[in-house]
Curated annotation (Swiss-Prot):
Changing A33Q: Impairs interaction with RNF2. GO terms for biological process: acute inflammatory response; fibroblast apoptotic process; fibroblast proliferation; intrinsic apoptotic signaling pathway in response to DNA damage by p53 class mediator; male gonad development; negative regulation of apoptotic process; negative regulation of autophagosome assembly; negative regulation of autophagy. It is found in: Nucleus; Cytoplasm; Cytoplasm, Perinuclear region. Transcription regulator that converts stress signals into a program of gene expression that empowers cells with resistance to the stress induced by a change in their microenvironment. Thereby participates in the regulation of many processes namely cell-cycle, apoptosis, autophagy and DNA repair responses. Controls cell cycle progression and protects cells from genotoxic stress induced by doxorubicin through the complex formation with TP53 and EP300 that binds CDKN1A promoter leading to transcriptional induction of CDKN1A. Monomer. Directly interacts with MSL1 and binds MORF4L1, two components of histone acetyltransferase complex; the interaction with MORF4L1 may be mediated by MSL1. Interacts with EP300; this interaction enhances the effect of EP300 on PAX2 transcription factor activity. Interacts with PAXIP1; this interaction prevents PAXIP1 inhibition of PAX2 transcription factor activity. Interacts with COPS5; this interaction allows COPS5-dependent CDKN1B nuclear to cytoplasm translocation. Interacts with RNF2. Interacts with FOXO3; this interaction represses FOXO3 transactivation. This is Nuclear protein 1. Widely expressed, with high levels in liver, pancreas, prostate, ovary, colon, thyroid, spinal cord, trachea and adrenal gland, moderate levels in heart, placenta, lung, skeletal muscle, kidney, testis, small intestine, stomach and lymph node, and low levels in brain, spleen, thymus and bone marrow. Not detected in peripheral blood leukocytes. One of its GO terms (molecular function) is DNA binding. It comes from Homo sapiens (Human). Keywords: Activator, Cytoplasm, DNA-binding, Nucleus, Phosphoprotein, Transcription, Transcription regulation. Residues 17-28 have a biased composition (Acidic residues). A motif (Nuclear localization signal) lies at residues 65-82. GO terms for cellular component: cytoplasm; intercellular bridge; nucleoplasm; nucleus; perinuclear region of cytoplasm; protein-DNA complex. It comes from the Eukaryota.
Length: 82
C-alpha cells in the first residue's frame, strides 16, 4: 500500500476579493467583499419597528381633518369677536 507524506502546510482559505483579477475596480471589490443584507425596502427598519410606526386606517374616517376644521373655525370666531 502507498503512503502519502504528511501534510505540512495549513489548509488554504478561499481567495478573498483582494486576490481576484486586477481588472476589478473599487465598486466591484466592494460588492464582492460586503454581502448585501435583505430588507432594503424597509428604510433600514425591522418589521416590528415598521409595524409600530405606520399609519393605520382609522375606522372613524377623517378625524384629524375634522378636528383641524373645528379648531380653525373656533380661532376665526375668537378673532372676529375682538
Amino acid at each position: 500500500m502507498a503512503t502519502f507524506p504528511p501534510a505540512t502546510s495549513a489548509p488554504q482559505q478561499p481567495p478573498g476579493p483582494e486576490d481576484e483579477d486586477s481588472s476589478l475596480d473599487e465598486s466591484d471589490l466592494y460588492s464582492l467583499a460586503h454581502s448585501y443584507l435583505g430588507g432594503g425596502g424597509r428604510k433600514g427598519r425591522t418589521k416590528r419597528e415598521a409595524a409600530a410606526n405606520t399609519n393605520r386606517p382609522s375606522p372613524g374616517g377623517h378625524e384629524r381633518k375634522l378636528v383641524t376644521k373645528l379648531q380653525n373655525s373656533e380661532r376665526k370666531k375668537r378673532g372676529a369677536r375682538r
